[in-house]
Curated annotation (Swiss-Prot):
Protein name listed in UniProt: UPF0335 protein WP0746
Pfam families assigned: GapR_DNA-bd
Domain of life: Bacteria
InterPro entries: GapR-like, GapR-like_DNA-bd
Similarity comment text for this entry: Belongs to the UPF0335 family.
Taxonomic lineage from the root: Bacteria, Pseudomonadati, Pseudomonadota, Alphaproteobacteria, Rickettsiales
Gene Ontology terms, MF aspect: DNA binding
Amino acid sequence: MEDTLKITAEDLKNYIERIEKLEQEKRDVQDHIRDVYAKAADEGWDIKVMKQIIRLRKMDDDDREEQEILLDTYKRALGMNYEGE
């Protein structure tokens, strides 16, 4: 029984340590992403728009098209002006 508990405890410790390492790597990646956004902002890029583009690029084409159609419909319903109108 003690051997089983020892093995189980070692397994648990290994999982915890792996998760902790991955969490640190995640923080490091988030820091790098923040640095890239800061550099882009320093060069005059609009960060909010960049984040929107990244979010849209993650979507599948059909979902993105559906969202754009709904956005257009809502804008028209609110009487928002469009180019060419």
